[in-house]
């Protein structure tokens, strides 16, 4: 009856019709403009068909439909209200046409039915789900809301409170949870999904009054009073505030919309949803979070693009090695073994090897306790790690990560030794360093083209970012191989060029220096932490310094003060971190830093104020005084932003997207802000330059570059 590139309409035996989603241009089905156009054309054919007893919706892909095509969101976000509402109303009209067909409809859900994929299923009279499938409306995690009837149909199906909870959280729901909620009507085994769905459709066709009576409930108001709905919405919003503050407004918009729509008919509620959907797309959070989603895809794509020229000749890593055990080495070994890569963990000290194995075992035990691994699987993973004191144990490894102590002389010696022990001249060697020049380390090697930096962030198992540091001699093939290796480890590789601090530490320490300058002017570091955590950082800069370790902080400053002396300048009379370090305060590692630490009931460090630190700072910097919140934000994020602009202009990082993703992956930069570059774009580059000029007399870190001023004058953005 109809055959498109993304879907087909077919007449089946027994006078049933089937719309089958099968995107020929991609690995998954999604509601991009082409699919929606083809669905519109198929609906014309469907309405003209005669002697039809029912409609079945299916998918030939491993998923049903994963939702709208986010790559098309920028066009949608730039539409006027009238244009946007007209587009949303058009799709909603098409979905409602399915719901209003004069015969029963059934959706057979496999894999994932997310966003618009679930919304079209909600139009059907019945939903049959594969036991391995999940459903969900994840739009709030993108800073938006369901826009094709999800806020209207789900509460009329499962009840207001449950629907609100699902939509606000954005979390996927398993087949069992969906069944218990009443969102689906039958769970089928994957191999019998279509057959079982057809049986349900045939039964409905034989009993017309049943499906017609169920439709009546879906077309009217929700079974709840406005007062009850308002109370439920308030509870849901308070729960969001307790977790995320006011930073994710989409959840609040959804709650307000669903309360307003609960007494309306379907069509009136959908009309209300169209306008609310437009409003939420105009927020900075929507732009940031959808940009984040696209940024994640871009980072992975860039890694694959780098590897493409070598795909025909390159082989995946068969055996890896980490040189240097302990906590970091054990974490790297664990990540390799977990992803199926055999790894040699080499050290010269048995105690360090024991600690590395213990770290890997601890992480595996945690996975077993959380139900993510079976005991047998954990044992199999651990068996992939080969601890060794023998240098010859790494001979046949094709990828080596050096992770010894952060001393240049030691690393250079170890790297030269490793290179001499490898049997293949094509083996790749990397250094897990956070501060040491890759170019200088390469001087110790005979084949520097096979060498680059591979900076893992701690803890390795939890932090997604790996900085791949390109040295002057690093070959494209080496960079491609290490990016591919990082992807196999489940990490997000971002390539940066060698410079002091590389990318993340360079811009992070600009922000930390911004904090230390404030403290030297009499600011209260506790107020700074409170303001920056309210702004969205996972922890304030003083607290973060304690977590990193003040010995590490002092070392990193020394690298940047030496490497970038024109902007990273000593603070008079002293940096607060140096004062604390000189007083043998190392942060969490010895319980004394900006804060004092003790173990809580869960055995984790808990911080409290330390009057001795406050007294020390008052004696050195004067009595603490309060600063305006906006000045604190501007002084800290402004320093980070201007340093990131310089990194972009110098080619340290290739694009604003990669720059922002590095901060989100590496330091937990608030996702709802989209990254430092997007934050500056939202601020406006003219205002960013004005902010920099305001504080440039305090430090050259704040001074805007000439290229940034030109962009600002032209009304351009970093993106």
What are these regions (language model features)?
Residues 107, 111-117:
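Gly/Ser-rich catalytic serine loop of serine hydrolases
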Residues 70:
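Glycine-rich phosphate-binding loops of nucleotide-dependent enzymes
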Residues 62-66, 114-115, 436-437:
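Short, active-site-adjacent cap segments at secondary-structure transitions
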């Amino acid at each position: 009856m109809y055959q498109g590139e993304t879907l087909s309409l077919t007449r089946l035996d027994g006078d049933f019709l089937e719309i089958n989603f099968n995107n020929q241009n991609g690995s998954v089905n999604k509601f991009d403009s082409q699919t929606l156009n083809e669905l519109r054309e198929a609906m014309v054919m469907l309405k003209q068909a005669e002697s039809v007893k029912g409609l079945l919706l299916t998918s030939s892909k491993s998923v049903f439909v994963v939702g709208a095509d986010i790559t098309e969101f920028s066009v949608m976000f730039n539409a006027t209200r009238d244009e946007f509402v007209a587009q949303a109303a058009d799709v909603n009209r098409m979905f409602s046409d399915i719901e209003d067909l004069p015969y029963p409809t059934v959706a057979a859900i496999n894999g994932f039915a997310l966003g618009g994929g679930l919304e079209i299923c909600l139009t059907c009279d019945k939903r049959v789900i594969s036991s391995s499938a999940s459903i969900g409306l994840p739009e709030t995690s993108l800073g938006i809301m369901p826009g094709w009837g999800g806020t209207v149909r789900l509460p009329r199906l499962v009840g207001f409170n449950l629907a609100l909870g699902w939509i606000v959280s954005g979390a996927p729901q398993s087949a069992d949870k969906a069944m218990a909620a009443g969102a689906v009507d039958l769970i089928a085994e994957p191999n019998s999904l279509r057959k079982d769905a057809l049986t349900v459709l045939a039964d409905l066709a034989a009993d017309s009054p049943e499906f017609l009576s169920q439709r009546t409930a879906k077309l009217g108001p929700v079974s709840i009073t406005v007062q009850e709905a308002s109370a439920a919405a308030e509870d849901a919003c308070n729960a969001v505030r307790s977790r995320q503050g006011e930073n994710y407004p989409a959840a609040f918009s959804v709650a307000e919309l669903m309360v307003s729509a609960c007494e309306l008919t379907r069509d009136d509620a959908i009309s209300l949803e169209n306008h609310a959907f437009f409003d939420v797309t105009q927020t900075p959070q929507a732009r940031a979070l959808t940009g984040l989603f696209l940024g994640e895809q871009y980072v992975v794509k860039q890694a694959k693009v780098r590897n493409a020229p070598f795909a025909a000749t390159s082989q995946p890593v068969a055996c890896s090695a980490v040189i240097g055990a302990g906590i970091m080495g054990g974490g790297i070994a664990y990540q390799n073994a977990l992803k199926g890569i055999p790894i040699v963990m080499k050290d010269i000290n048995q105690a360090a090897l024991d600690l590395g194995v213990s770290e890997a075992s601890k992480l595996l035990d945690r996975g077993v306790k959380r139900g993510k691994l079976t005991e047998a699987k954990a044992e199999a993973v651990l068996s992939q790690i080969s601890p060794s004191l023998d240098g010859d144990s790494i001979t046949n490894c094709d990828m080596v990560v050096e992770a010894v102590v952060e001393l240049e002389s030691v690393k250079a010696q170890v790297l030269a030794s490793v290179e001499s022990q490898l049997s293949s001249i094509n083996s790749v060697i990397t250094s897990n360093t956070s501060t040491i020049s890759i170019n200088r380390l390469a001087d110790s090697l005979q084949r520097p083209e096979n060498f680059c930096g591979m900076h893992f962030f701690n803890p390795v198992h939890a932090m997604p970012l790996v900085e791949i540091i390109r040295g002057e001699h690093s070959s494209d093939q080496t960079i491609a191989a290490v990016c591919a290796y990082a992807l196999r480890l489940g990490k997000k590789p971002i390539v940066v060029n060698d410079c002091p601090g590389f990318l993340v530490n360079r811009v992070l320490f600009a922000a930390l220096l911004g904090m230390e300058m404030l403290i030297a002017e009499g600011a209260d570091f506790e107020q700074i932490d409170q303001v920056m955590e309210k702004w969205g950082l996972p922890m304030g800069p003083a607290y973060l310094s304690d977590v990193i370790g003040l010995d590490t902080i002092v070392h990193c400053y020394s690298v940047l003060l030496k490497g970038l002396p024109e902007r990273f300048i000593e603070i008079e009379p002293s940096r607060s971190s140096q004062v604390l370090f000189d007083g043998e305060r190392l942060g969490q590692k010895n319980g004394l830093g900006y804060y004092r630490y003790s173990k809580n009931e869960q055995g984790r460090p808990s911080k409290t104020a330390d009057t001795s630190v406050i007294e020390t700072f008052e004696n050195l910097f004067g009595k603490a005084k309060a600063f305006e919140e906006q000045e604190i934000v501007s002084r800290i994020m402004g320093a980070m932003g201007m340093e990131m602009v310089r990194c972009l202009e110098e080619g340290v990082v290739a694009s604003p997207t990669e720059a922002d993703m590095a901060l989100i992956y590496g330091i937990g930069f608030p996702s709802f802000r989209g990254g430092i570059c997007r934050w500056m774009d939202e601020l406006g580059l003219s205002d960013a330059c004005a902010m920099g000029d305001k504080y440039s007399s305090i430090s050259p870190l704040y001074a805007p570059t000439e290229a940034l001023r030109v962009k600002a004058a032209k009304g351009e953005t970093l993106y």
